[in-house]
Each structure stands twice: as structure tokens, then as C-alpha cells.
Amino acid sequence: MGPGENLVTLARDAARDALKNAGVELSQVSGIFSSCNPTTDYLMPTLAPMVAAKLDIKHVLACNVGMGCAGGVQALQACFNQLLADSARGKVSTYILVTGDHISRMLDPESWKTAILFSDGISAVVVTNNPEATGGFVIEHVASECYAGEEVAVINLPNPLAAREAGSTGPCLLQMRGRGVFEFGTRIAPRVKELVGITNFEEFYVIPHQANIRMINELIPTFDIKPEQLYVDGITKIGNISGAACFLGLEDIMSRPLANNYDKILLCAFGAELQVAVAVLSR
């Protein structure tokens, strides 16, 4: 983060850019969904209401989904479900979805397990049920599942209040067991096909969570796709930006000619909460 910057100011600026690109005015915004772990300056309020305040948007829904690296796609699911409810009432709505983390502030700079992997950043997208909207993608399907009961200690961030009550005076930093994360990510990949109900990914470009290049490459045989159908540039260029990773990847490929080669996009993410979330987008 630069001088005077924090996650809220980055999210505000990203939201403004997303609205401009979508041709949407602030007055048309029905609410803000966000996905952020406790990496902002406050545990409460969360990212969504703080961004709403920065944008000077009043009397709107502001909801945060804190589900680790899967949170961005899960927040998209929450937003999608809200739009379904709005449509059922005959209401046209437009929401901003911002997702990301200032994750460097909770890393141990001497830990090679985390310090060289994670990055700070934010993404923003506009989601609407407006039948007159043009460009962008249609959300065909979203789904998610939780596996946290299996092994919570794979990735965790201790609660500073609980640590203080236990007599600890040290910093509460992110803890990760890399082997456990890798095993979960590779084991859960076949389940993604079941969640989206698709067996043939020939028409798809796949944007997985950018956590580990070996884990990402495991999707090639699992989905029976070609290497050029798989996005890997996030982890190699900017690192793991938590719930923003899939959306930053989507923005990245939209500026490339290869994006025109595929009619469908698969977003698949998994995260610290041992959650998996998927979304199918089409043109």
C-alpha cells in the first residue's frame, strides 16, 4: 500500500472504475457486496459499509462475506441470489462487488510459507439484473460448499482477543500448512465438475484461484483441458490476492485476444475456510 492508501480507498477507487466501465451511475447502485478477511483497519465495520460511505451511497444494502480465498466467488453467489430475489419481486437492481485483502499486514516476513506467496490488492465488478445491460458476462451458475470441519488448522488467523485472554503478547499472524492446502486443493478439484454439472470443458477458459502453480496445473488432467485454457499468470506475476484472485484474472484475460476464443468462463476458488466456490459465466 502506498502513502495514504488502505484497503477501503483501493476498494473505493476500484468500484468507481468498475461503474465507469459498466456505464452505471452511483444513483443506480442498490448495494455493495464485499469479501474481505479481517485485514482492514477495523474488524467492524466491514469493507462493504465503509466503501459505501466513501462513495457517499446511502440507504443501500452493504454485506460482507469473509470466506478466505473462496470469498470472492461466494460473495458473487450471495449477490446473484439477491438479484434472483429482487427479480422475483419485479425489482431491477445493480450491485457492486468488491473483494480483496491487505494481507501483508498479517504475514510473518520471515516465513517462507506465507511471506513470498500472498499479495495485497482489490477487485471490483458490477452485477445487475437489468435486461438492458450490455457487454460483460451472464452468470449461468454459482455454487459453493464448506469443508472446514475436516481440518481447520490448515490455514488460520488467530483471534487477537482470544490470544490476549490466553496470555499471549505476540502478534497474531497468518499460519498455513502448505502440504495440507495442496492436498485439499487437488482432492477437491473433481468435485468442481459436480458442482457445476459439467463434464466437457472444451468451450471453457478456466480461471482458478491463484494459490500454487502445481495445484493449478492439476486441473489440466482433471478437466481434460489444454494448458492454454488455464489461467496461471496471477500467481506468477502478482501472487495470491485472496478472494480477488479470480476476478483479477478475469480482468487480465479480457484485455487479451485469447479471451475471444472461448464462450464460457469457469471461476473456481478454494480458501482458508476450506471452502470451494465455483461460477460459470457466458457471453
Spans of features found by a protein language model:
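Claisen-condensing/thiolase-fold acyl-transfer catalytic domains that form or cleave C-C bonds
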Residues: R12, T39-T40, M44-P45, K58, ...
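Conserved active-site "lid/cap" helical segment
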Residues: M1-S30, L43, P109, P158-F204, ...
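Glycine/charged-rich beta-loop-alpha catalytic/anionic-binding loops adjacent to active sites
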Residues: S30-S34, A52-G66, M106-D108, I225-D233
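Condensing-enzyme catalytic core mediating Claisen C-C bond formation in acyl metabolism
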Residues: M1-N6, P109-E183, F270, R283
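Flexible, glycine-rich active-site loops centered on histidine and acidic residues
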Residues: L84-G121
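Short beta-strand segments
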Residues: G66, Y95-D101, V127, L267-F270
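A short glycine/serine-rich beta->alpha loop
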Residues: M1-P3, N37-P38, L61-V65, E110-W112, ...
